[in-house]
């Protein structure tokens, strides 16, 4: 969208490791993180080399809670500011605008008192303690001026906040005269959006907000790892555990680079198309593009707790089904193979100690069994990192191929919005798979390393979780890169064959 | 030791659809021949190390492009960042040979301001009985464009190794003579990393000798 640029500018990015981000599992292990950086441990360099830049700010739910209060407070007591900073989700902005324009020029009667309004609004939003609210209100009015700045600060990376608050601000007057419904609605919507959860829009925004591209981040990581490997003269054994090097070996970097290239080109194309349109045509298209964008905010990732590990076929079937609904050949789904290999390996390495034991009894080779176990935790770790790198590289490849096919595939049988939803599902499935896989590997590690010192075992476990979490982030970021291609596909399907499209839509629905 | 190389060259493989680009690359990088091969979507990536002189390795990053016309706009974008290329035609398919001109014209337009060192490859030379393009005319065409000509077969593993290593050596010579230089923002040639302790196999040999003394 044309207004995406604006949302990109006020970004404060900071390099932070992304824990429990998108993937709820690794958060548990955050405590043991510091241990992993100890010099002696193998995972040290792995953990420290690659940090993914992440948009800062507003993980804090309180900020989100306070925000509408501050906003409405400001709206009540201050003149409505019309300079709407159009950031991010233009949908909100335009929605707010239309509300504003539909409202008559009625002067605000602050008869009910702003705190009343807030209280009511807050109750309807289901915020528990009234006393807490009143302190917030007090706080809000006290630091109102500063608060406004705060709003801007908070909204920086998340365009939505500022647009919501602007919407609230701009509608403030009419809201109070016209009843509380609108405010309630805004509030509810706000909460819904916020409640949609971190993964959703952190991911949506995460990538766009960064100054460097994902492949740059990974390339730098790879370089560092190369340097590290070479300076340590450790060679083969250590290379095995370097995620970045392995990711490149599986051509993940190249596919990512190619995907970024397509994404950039498509983005430019979309912008120029939007610039060439005007009036009704533009509005309709914008609306449709917004729908597409919505499909790109991911479903929640942390709700899979109850699912546990499903059967082997499920992942394969799910992915294949999803791709067949994309009308993209599932033969391209290389990730399935990589993932199955990983499971086979886990299967054998889990049963191995048992078999070893039985044989040990037969042949009384106690020493060699210990040797096997000793080797195996490093082996498991190496294999885990390798599998994660491979699965991630395959996923990126999958997205790259999807992008090429979306842009230059056969005639469309599926709408862009449907494709987006399906791809969003694919992303979720892949990330879940990573999470399950990392759990399997750590179980493996724990089992194999019962006799090991925690100082040896924990960093390895942490590294697996960390890489799994990073992998999930890369996949989600790569998914976001697909948006411009689907926008193109949507525009093309509209302009090239309007009649056909209607027919197809009906057919597909 | 795998990770040590002097340079990384990016090579692009182009030519008509179904001339056997992916099969040639797979033979070179994976050492096997796939009887059935799906048409390439957009672009695929492969890599392999090549030892051009004892202890001197070059990492080849090979970009396998789709021959299908519909992906042309994607594949065009990759010419610019390649230092070398294999231009394939199928010796049993005259049309694919006639299209060599077009391929060269297209690359010329899109590679600016850089240059690609091309080798012309007559592929599927195991199917000599079905040959539609003589070696002589192919060599003539190659010479006209200043290219080398080589005939290969992925199925029977004929000249596959040679096609890639000869091209790599030619590029390496140009790099050594300074006619091709590493440039910021250009992915064609990149210097590899040389570990600071073990420099090359010569040094390894030296140190071993020292140990013997």
UniProtKB/Swiss-Prot annotation, chain B:
Amino acids binding GTP: 17, 20-23, 37, 40, 67, 123-124, 126, 154-155
Residues with PTM Cysteine methyl ester: 213
Region (Switch-I): 35-43
Hydrolase among keywords: yes
Modified residues (Phosphoserine): 201
UniProt superkingdom: Eukaryota
Cellular localisation: Cell membrane; Cytoplasmic vesicle membrane; Golgi apparatus; Cytoplasmic vesicle, Autophagosome membrane
Membrane topology note: Lipid-anchor
Class of the enzyme per the UniProt entry, highest EC level: hydrolase
Binding site for Mg(2+): 22, 40, 64
Activity regulation information from UniProt: Regulated by guanine nucleotide exchange factors (GEFs) including C9orf72-SMCR8 complex, which promote the exchange of bound GDP for free GTP. Regulated by GTPase activating proteins (GAPs) which increase the GTP hydrolysis activity. Inhibited by GDP dissociation inhibitors (GDIs).
Enzyme Commission number(s) from the entry: 3.6.5.2
UniProt tissue specificity: Highly expressed in the brain.
Cofactor: Mg(2+)
GO CC terms, sorted: cytoplasmic vesicle membrane; Golgi apparatus; neuron projection; plasma membrane; vesicle
InterPro entries reported in the protein's UniProt record: P-loop_NTPase, Rab39, Rab_GTPases_membrane_traffic, Small_GTP-bd, Small_GTPase
Domain notes: Switch I, switch II and the interswitch regions are characteristic of Rab GTPases and mediate the interactions with Rab downstream effectors. The switch regions undergo conformational changes upon nucleotide binding which drive interaction with specific sets of effector proteins, with most effectors only binding to GTP-bound Rab.
Family matches, as NCBIfam families: small_GTP
Known partners and oligomeric status: Interacts (GDP-bound) with C9orf72; C9orf72 in complex with SMCR8 acts as a GEF for RAB39B. Interacts (in GTP-bound form) with PICK1 (via PDZ domain); a PICK1 homodimer may allow simultaneous association of RAB39B and GRIA2 to PICK1 which is involved in GRIA2 trafficking. Interacts with isoform c of RASSF1; the interaction is strong. Interacts with isoform a of RASSF1; the interaction is weak. Interacts with the DLG4/PSD-95. Interacts (GTP-bound) with HOPS complex components VPS39 and VPS41.
Disease: Intellectual developmental disorder, X-linked 72: A disorder characterized by significantly below average general intellectual functioning associated with impairments in adaptive behavior and manifested during the developmental period. Intellectual deficiency is the only primary symptom of non-syndromic X-linked forms, while syndromic forms present with associated physical, neurological and/or psychiatric manifestations. XLID72 patients can manifest autism spectrum disorder, seizures and macrocephaly as additional features. Waisman syndrome: A neurologic disorder characterized by delayed psychomotor development, intellectual disability, and early-onset Parkinson disease.
Protein name: Ras-related protein Rab-39B
Protein source organism: Homo sapiens
